[in-house]
């Protein structure tokens, strides 16, 4: 038997599928979500929400107060797209060259709007609902900027929830994990400086490219020799930018790294070792290495009690077979900044399907699975009515 909430929401499913596809056609990257945020604000205003714009530039918060309840619930969706070219071949594919909703944030935004319309119309809760539409998740600091701009000072929350669609998991299955669920992320640049010169007389130079290669190799010892094998960590040198000519020894190299961990102490150890190794390796060649921490986000940790509520609501809506535990993974999510401020919160996944030909996120052929809109909206509504009762 279908749950009554699903039946009530299904009436408007086609409307929100169409909205999701319109968002998909007009993708906007981090901190440039002007058209998206304007449409979000317009719809929330039409449905009776108090609308606030401007946090983190393009962020939107919609507030709905119902009854005399004192509790305050936050639901968050991300809005930004990726700087990628889409190759899905869908009729609603991106109309913006080099911009693409390749992670499903068009679907996340629409899912929360789908729930917002129902909750404002039915109003079967008592308390304050804060709907948070966040920019720049793909940059991994849009959430941090919203918090720094006073998100929780202006819009207090006693609990907060976020979700993400997940290709590779069974369709509609809710994935939960207590504690550490997603990795911290740190982006670092290492600038190596040596002495340039002609490739025919290397004895008069300090080869910055050679130094960068030694640093790259030495960094791989961190995970295998400085970190216990029981704690996952990743150190990846993703870019080494040196010269262009075959007969010139470079005096300057820029290295770009990413670091992922599931433990803050491990994170600190890895970052310190990167610094120590880079500086020492450079000095051994009479070069210098300067490190810059470009940005970082913390480990995403879920509160077990709040997770239990998600599990309870999801089981009632979809059945126990559609709720399960997931392993932690080394991807990162800046919703972690919000959970860091408000540890009574939960981030969960919704399976987008595990067919062999289903594209993963960040793949040029990816498209959000519209079947998830109803699932996600029902879960948002169920959580709201459960928490604010």
List where the protein language model places each region.
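A structural signal for isolated positions on well-ordered beta-strands in alpha/beta enzyme cores
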Residues: 52, 130-132, 290
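Histidine/acidic-residue-rich, glycine-tolerant segments that coordinate divalent metal ions
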Residues: 60-61, 82-84, 88-100, 106-115, ...
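Short beta-strand-to-loop capping motifs
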Residues: 64, 192-194, 259-261
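Active-site beta-loop-alpha junctions enriched in small/polar residues
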Residues: 28, 78-80, 136-138, 166, ...
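Metal-dependent amide/peptide-bond hydrolase catalytic core
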Residues: 210-389
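Acidic/His- and Gly-rich active-site-bordering loop/insert found
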Residues: 2-101, 106, 110-113, 117-125
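Non-cysteine beta-strand/loop elements that form the S-adenosyl-L-methionine
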Residues: 74-76, 188-190, 346-352
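Divalent metal-coordination and catalytic microenvironments
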Residues: 23, 62, 75, 105, ...
